[in-house]
A protein has these predicted regions:
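A bilobed periplasmic-binding-protein/Venus flytrap-type ligand-binding module shared by bacterial periplasmic
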Residues: 76-87, 192-205
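Ligand-binding "clamshell"
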Residues: 57-69, 84, 156, 161, ...
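Short helix-initiation/N-cap motifs at beta->coil->alpha
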Residues: 26-37, 125-152
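Alpha-to-beta junction loops
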Residues: 40-50, 94, 117, 138-141, ...
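Short, polar/charged alpha-helical segment
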Residues: 1-25, 34, 38
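Pocket-flanking alpha-helical
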Residues: 32-63, 85, 168-171
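A conserved helix-loop-strand patch within extracytoplasmic ligand-binding domains
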Residues: 69-118, 221
Length: 278
């Protein structure tokens, strides 16, 4: 979830502008259950609030038939400066603070691995803990803390690993301050990307494809990059996703989503999108 305000509420204006031949109605829910129920029942066409593990768990527990129609954005973990402001300055015995809850710790460790600081055991993946560290060439000390406490030890550890929300609360900008962050082709980004969810069988419908195409358009990507300064990153399906360039994002001009218009229905149909707000 991007913020306490709804995702599609913030994206509604640029999205509606690009849909042109269809109208988009956004309804905000204040829980994580009802948005899936109304899509399952057919009352709404789609929702946009959840990542794939939650969607899969919901289907298993509730017997629903919801599927991922397209990944739109993810909120990256980043390595931020503590007492050192460059990963090139890493020395033997340096300490790195990470969140200690299961999911967040695994993402932090994977990010450290992606940057050559540690190596995890094969298959550890998103269940990794410090016990899964197979190689630690710099003998770094992994300091495990409650997630909200990690940003408070920047004066005590060489680096800290934070998720987007806590980075923002600590005054960090992903685009300007992160020494490294999760890329679209990372295991974590592919798993925790926020998706458009629809009832099985509707994922290839013309209006759902029009919605997904618009939300993945250059215009919406530019909007997200400008609005969130790296705290939220458009998800790229390709494995060679480009790194975010906040300077380019600041200068980006709005682009027309002509491809989405080509796929939109000829009649002015309505896409009802259920969405959760934190």
């Amino acid at each position: 979830m991007m913020t306490r305000q709804s995702q599609l509420q913030r994206l509604q204006h640029p999205t509606q502008k690009s849909l042109k031949k269809q109208s988009l109605e956004v309804t905000v829910f204040d829980d994580y259950v009802r948005p899936n129920e109304v899509v399952e029942s057919g009352e709404f066409d789609a929702n946009y609030f959840q990542h794939i593990p939650y969607l899969d768990q919901f289907n298993e527990e509730k017997g629903t038939h919801l599927v991922n129609a397209g990944g739109i954005h993810y909120e990256p973990f980043g390595i931020y400066p503590g007492t050192k402001d460059s990963l090139d300055d890493l020395k033997d015995g340096d300490s790195i603070a990470v969140p200690n809850d299961t999911t967040n710790e695994a993402r932090a460790l994977l990010l450290l691995q992606d940057n050559g600081i540690i190596t995890l055991k094969d298959g550890a993946g998103l269940n990794a803990t410090v016990k899964d560290i197979a190689e630690n060439p710099h003998n770094v000390e992994i300091v495990e803390l409650e997630a909200a406490q990690v940003a408070r030890v920047t004066g005590e550890t060489a680096y800290v690993v934070l998720n987007g929300n806590y980075a923002l609360e600590a005054g960090f900008s992903v685009g300007k301050d992160a020494l490294a962050y999760e890329k679209s082709d990372s295991e974590a980004a592919k798993t925790y990307v926020n998706v458009i969810a629809v009832k099985e069988g509707n994922e290839d419908s013309e209006k759902i494809q029009a919605l997904v195409d618009v939300l993945k358009s250059d215009e919406i990507k530019d909007f997200i990059n400008e609005k969130y300064d790296g705290a939220v990153i458009p998800f790229e399906e390709s494995s060679d996703a480009e790194e975010i360039d906040t300077e380019d994002a600041d200068d980006a001009d709005s682009k027309d989503a002509d491809n989405a218009d080509d796929t939109a229905e000829e009649n002015a149909d309505t896409t009802d999108t259920a969405e959760d707000a934190e």
